[in-house]
UniProtKB/Swiss-Prot annotation:
Its main location: cytoplasm. GO terms for biological process: 2-oxoglutarate metabolic process. The keyword Cytoplasm applies. Binds 1 FAD per subunit. One of its GO terms (cellular component) is cytoplasm. FAD binds at E33, G34, R35, S36, T37, L38, G39, G40, T41, C42, K51, G115, D313, A321. Belongs to the class-I pyridine nucleotide-disulfide oxidoreductase family. GO terms for molecular function: dihydrolipoyl dehydrogenase (NADH) activity; flavin adenine dinucleotide binding. The active site is at H445. Its cofactor is FAD. This is Dihydrolipoyl dehydrogenase 3. The gene is lpd3. It catalyses: N(6)-[(R)-dihydrolipoyl]-L-lysyl-[protein] + NAD(+) = N(6)-[(R)-lipoyl]-L-lysyl-[protein] + NADH + H(+).
């Protein structure tokens, strides 16, 4: 039985980053992963391939519509979907090979197979051929990620009724794509196929899109997506979906009750969220339990069992790759005897549509519920010079600060390239910056980031460019 300082079950963003940091700190480490490639859902069938398609589809729509023509670029593009998928796959392959290189560089053993616990300090790995290998470790990190949440009454066959993985590799552009769920996954993948020519209808049980985000930014995003042609049926639920060789027949009902309606689609994407993947881990062998969703109840990263840690989507908090990465670093450094904590109040979230939505910290709704006094500064991209000359003026920046101390409590952005701007406020808020600190900090001109400074100025009504 081979022995390690740390054995990590799962090779996604949490698992592979934990393995790399363990190697950097001089720990002997093995990462158990049953996929043929490292990177987990995010790299293989999630974050990265979806961004590749979002980028390509955005350029295609710009070239085939009025956007390029308005700039004096007159072209008539032809969609080569097979090539678009090929470049997406090539990008993903390059990234997975990069992780393999980092494993070799940091002396991480990749044990190929599916891991399960076998009591404290032991992991059994089952390879594809059925053979099993036992590993021993001082510390075990569970980083098995998540899987798409199924919808009762709707059977995902990945032929006509698909999950997010299926939506990344459709063989043709659907005439009509129905998306069940108006969260990150549904809106991003719905945007891809709408840009490529699909009619897209989004069905959401709640009366709003982007649950959990700032209401005002979500409404602005919905308005922008609707203007682009995306159809929303909010406050609705799918009670039946029947697939055939050439499409899907759906039955919808109002969430609050009422008259049902029928809907036809070429494909249906079920994107109602994700749930922790803890099947087959044999958690009971170490005395760990999960809740109804399969989530490990213990707060991350240490569990109630000495020597067993849990990070990423299998535990509480947002199911985001960067949250898993932060937990990975904190977990391994604590194993190595170094103090390290994750600031769960400052985990940013992004929706990579056009316009983009980005958020960090508290929303107005949360602060009202807490009874905390606050002030708000907003600045529209219509008043930002770079946004105007680039003809991307939808959206705004919103900064929320404490009414007395002026400390920034939350930042909510909807607009062009805001995914690349939210990090500024993550840093600022980590150091308890005030809105005035941001307002007094020079920003380059002309950039979209100036909208952030102007919003911070406007917390006290002092924006200069509106």
């Amino acid at each position: 039985m081979k022995s390690y300082d740390v054995v990590i079950i799962g090779g996604g963003p949490g698992g592979y980053n934990a393995a790399i940091r363990a190697g950097q700190l001089g720990l002997t480490v093995a990462c158990v992963e049953g996929r043929s490639t490292l990177g987990g859902t995010c790299l293989n069938v999630g974050c990265m391939p979806s961004k590749a398609l979002l980028h390509a589809s955005e350029l295609y729509e710009a070239a085939s519509g009025d956007e390029f023509a308005h700039l004096g670029i007159e072209v008539k593009p032809t969609l080569n979907l097979a090539q678009m998928m090929k470049q997406k796959d090539e990008s993903v392959t390059g990234l997975t090979k990069g992780i393999e290189y980092l494993f070799r560089k940091n002396k991480v053993d990749w044990i190929k197979g599916w891991g399960r616990l076998d009591g404290v300090g032991k992991v059994v790995v089952k390879a594809e051929d059925g053979s099993e290998t036992a590993l021993q470790a001082k510390d075990i990190v569970i980083a098995t990620g998540s899987e798409p949440t199924p919808l009762p009454g709707v059977t995902i066959d990945n032929q006509r009724i698909i999950d997010s993985t299926g939506a990344l590799s459709l063989p043709q552009v659907p005439k009509h794509l129905v998306v069940i769920g108006a969260g990150v996954i549904g809106l991003e993948l719905g945007s891809v196929w709408r840009r490529l020519g699909s009619q897209v209808t989004v069905i959401e049980y709640l009366d709003r899109i982007c649950p959990g985000t700032d209401t005002e930014t979500a409404k602005t995003l919905q308005k922008a997506l609707a203007k682009q042609g995306m159809v929303f049926k909010l406050g609705s639920k799918v009670t039946q979906a029947t697939a055939s060789a050439d499409g899907v027949s759906l039955v919808l009902e109002p969430a609050a009750g009422g008259t049902a309606e029928s809907l036809q689609a070429d494909y249906v994407l079920v994107a109602i969220g994700r749930r922790p993947y803890t099947k087959g881990l044999n958690l009971e062998s170490v005395g760990l339990e999960t809740d109804k969703r399969g989530m490990l109840a213990q707060r991350t990263p240490p569990t109630s069992v000495p020597g067993v840690w849990v990070i990423g989507d299998v535990t509480s908090g947002p199911m985001l790759a960067h949250k898993a990465e932060d937990e990975a670093v904190a977990c391994i450094e604590r194993i190595a005897g170094k103090p390290h904590e994750v600031n769960y109040n400052l985990i940013p979230g992004v929706i990579y549509t056009r316009p983009e939505l980005a958020t960090v910290g508290k929303t107005e709704e949360q602060l009202k519920a807490e009874g905390r006094a606050y002030k708000v500064g907003k600045f529209p991209f219509t008043a930002n010079s770079r946004a105007k000359i680039n003809h991307e003026t939808e959206g705004f920046a919103k900064v929320i600060a404490d009414a007395e101390t002026d400390e920034v409590l939350g930042v909510h952005l909807v607009g062009p390239s805001v995914s690349e701007m939210i990090g500024e406020f993550c840093v600022a808020m980590e150091f308890s910056a005030s809105a005035e600190d941001i307002a007094l900090t020079c920003h380059p001109h002309p950039t979209r980031s100036e909208a952030l400074r102007q919003a911070a100025m406007n917390v006290d009504g002092m924006a200069m460019q509106i």
